[in-house]
């Protein structure tokens, strides 16, 4: 056995046992700045013999590194790198990792003590990992209120339009002149879902009317799920899943959305429910006709959100024709009214109405009120019933003869909407948009949601609550259209109310279309038929009323019957709705890695492809709005004819045809269809910032609200009405105090200021905890500030002074870092007192422990890869070439162990003395289960398919400071001169880096700029020592084509130049990409290597491994002349400018808050009575403002609007 291995067996260290695999095979070839650190870890794993001291071993290692540093990172390019730094890492997180490792080395000798601690902590880990307990009540109390008019503030004109709509509805509702309108109540109809709408009372009828949202365009849920296949082995595969419109599609990754692996039409789903297994509470099942799909989410909260979203989408699909829902109940059929309480702080009116005279079946309707209107409506209905009886109207059923399935004094049963064994289902109302149809046949869609019976003695017709509606009610507003504000004046005339005929539905008689194909058969390709004809098939054109009309003499146009049949098959293949119209079809090849033979479809909305090869199920759905252009290529293969489709922000799509005429016709038709949709493209994509932000906030807040209702035992999705005149706002009813904890440089603090301003706009109080040097900056934005220790300048100075690892550095690090981290932990604990929610940069190290001690929700936020994934390596261990998923995942494991090894001693001591918590370890902390917000664009950092649901890539948190920067006159003259000479202007700046020869680096940049023939805005900050006050100055005279600008606001400068060269910090990279500038990155340390590779991967710039005259000049020419890079950077800039990172982050905080609360663990929980008291206090605080004054409720009874619908759960 090798000597190293035997020595390792004799004396294993605590650090060694925490590692999963031998790191030497992975990290020795790394060229990142942390490579030396990784080498030291690999070597320190093998403890020397008894005669060899630790100090002598470290001296040998230091000598090894000094000798090897000259050849470190060398390749065939032997040209020097003038930008080589004097120290290993300067990014703050990198410094922390390096310093923590140095400190951790001193603990390697304490084997017995370490073994005891490790054994104790591993025994504790099992109890901490139990996540099956119920989540505590969230800190958010959500209210729903009605804003002013959605178009503008409520005016007399808009009120008159609303009254005209009501009059139009009542006129259609009431065919008899003797029926009069009485009252209107804002309420929610409780069925499978809770639907916001209005209840209208007349002297003879009760109506419920609601506008159903059109989820086709504004509803989009994405995330990763596991699809479980097989019943015995239960194999599962992870996919990126997108719920949009009426389809649920599965993809390989978040960047491969044009090639769905599986598409499910929601109209084919008969039910969706959580599985009843207690061992797997994160699974849910989709029933698709006679099949079922089992999906698994990462958490119970995520699974519940997916089920809720799919249910709402299914309901909306059933009402997609009119986007409205109407129920009509004759008052004389009402047999009982009961006011009850289902949800906290709300009133519920249960109405039992006779359904059928022959069977005396009774239906139950539940109307939920949040303004005390339940009793008012009950009294009004009772009064109207008495009037009807006094006037001689016959009450069809004696109230006393109908047995109530649920007594007034009985306790409401717990709801279980996911029990498939119960047949008391709720059947949705059907809206029929047909002027010729006067009756409604029994429906065929079985409800996805079921209720659990409380007693087997109940009749099938008398469920607990809510019971199954045994008939389908025809829509009373068949063609009520939601148009743009300019069309509201004609909205009243479009309302068409139709009569209906009630009927019974027998569950056993429900059947489906026998001719419809199953999901599996749709994905199964047909065998070749008439292969010779298909090989050189002519195009086929299809005429439609709504699409392009081909001339009558067109030889390729199919007749009407074939067109109809082809349209039906086309919609079935790709799960499109009836609005999709096929324009043309072709046979050809999709050329990705290899040519795939199949059929190409062009519709009025999409370009599609379907493989015809046996065993190949490739499909493509490319929206026309994403297509920029198409053009002919001579050929990709001999004998074939090529067509290239240019996609916005995506690589091109290549098609091949065996027939030249087919290729030319496809190009012609494609351009015609693109021209037809081009006029609508701007309308489809142009949404105001306020509208997008509102939609993001609404979706997240609604998810939070549903979770709070679920905590009370009611798993009920909510649908908020899309009223054309009012918009419903869901927002926290109480201001809470957020603590944002971060340490580091100005670039580390800036995103938190942007997030703080967004949270303040939501009505919350925000405090940023960071270094004192940023106080004035933070306070200038009216944000709270608390100072903590941990300024990285001390560590930076320490690293620069020593340059490489040696015994002096180890001794200084052991002393300075220990004091530094102790001060940081203590001040962070003091600063976090009194906050309700903590968001922390993980480099601050203290947050996860403080949140545990304070028992508050905890989030992490960072700018670089910090969570385990196979898609990206850790930002500090980026290899010189891609090495695959195993290596990437291992880098995260390696870094976590290194990082924790260095700080664990101090942290555990601090936990015991200050926080009064027991010791912990990596397993007990569960830091990979913490909700994580990446403030990076998903274009630069696409979410990996193996990211858990609680990991969100939100987009950049830009801080657009409106400071009036006034450039010097000579600066503007320089820029104007460059434009006059038609010279490209580039920005070059690397921050305050420390290099060996700063003068030589300046000379190299000057020569490279001259060779490239561009003008340069230079921001010099490099020097040969840390903190040099003369770093910004240049001793020599600069040529006329270079201007030393110093620090200039990026949001001002980047709009006036053509390209950038910088070090690759997250903030600078985001600013240059948002401006649409080609970017050259010369990384020096930390996450800069990661962003250099990402910018090059997405085609927006160049990553420089070495900076010298030739390499920089070549890169400058490339980014200023290569049209492909320039166009790609511009496209990425347009996409990033449409992102709303702060709004997305706030939405993620809301949506993941319940999950964050469920992770709060402590080894010594508080007494149950204390918990109950805290919960009671929290509930009482729900209607109290931040100042402690009782919130005044706005009464709107009788107003007929929803501006008083407060929901305080």
Curated annotation (Swiss-Prot):
Enzyme class: transferase
Chief site of localization: cytoplasm
Keyword Lipid biosynthesis carried by entry: yes
Lineage: Eukaryota, Fungi, Dikarya, Ascomycota, Saccharomycotina
Domain of life (superkingdom): Eukaryota
Pfam families assigned: EryCIII-like_C (PF06722), Glyco_transf_28 (PF03033), GRAM (PF02893), PH (PF00169)
InterPro entries: ATG26_PH_GRAM1, ATG26_PH_GRAM2, EryCIII-like_C, Glycosyltransferase_28, GlycoTrans_28_N, GRAM, PH-like_dom_sf, PH_domain
Keyword annotations of the record: Cytoplasm, Glycosyltransferase, Lipid biosynthesis, Lipid metabolism, Membrane, Repeat, Steroid biosynthesis, Steroid metabolism, Sterol biosynthesis, Sterol metabolism, Transferase
Catalysed reaction equations from the record: a sterol + UDP-alpha-D-glucose = a sterol 3-beta-D-glucoside + UDP + H(+); ergosterol + UDP-alpha-D-glucose = ergosteryl 3-beta-D-glucoside + UDP + H(+)
Residues in GRAM domain copies: 167-217, 568-634
Binding site for UDP-alpha-D-glucose: 745-746, 748, 1019, 1048, 1050, 1063, 1066-1068, 1087-1088
Entry GO MF terms: sterol 3-beta-glucosyltransferase activity
Similarity field: Belongs to the glycosyltransferase 28 family.
A single GO BP: sterol biosynthetic process
Record's compositionally biased regions (Low complexity): 1196-1209
Functional summary from the UniProt entry: Sterol glycosyltransferase responsible for the glycosylation of ergosterol to form ergosterol-glucoside.
Gene3D superfamilies: Glycogen Phosphorylase B, Pleckstrin-homology domain (PH domain)/Phosphotyrosine-binding domain (PTB)
Cell location: Cytoplasm; Membrane
UniProt KW Repeat keyword: yes
Region (Disordered): 1186-1209
Designated name of the protein: Sterol 3-beta-glucosyltransferase
EC number, UniProt record: 2.4.1.-, 2.4.1.173
Gene: ATG26
GO cellular component: cytoplasm; membrane
PH domain location: 218-315
Membrane topology: Peripheral membrane protein
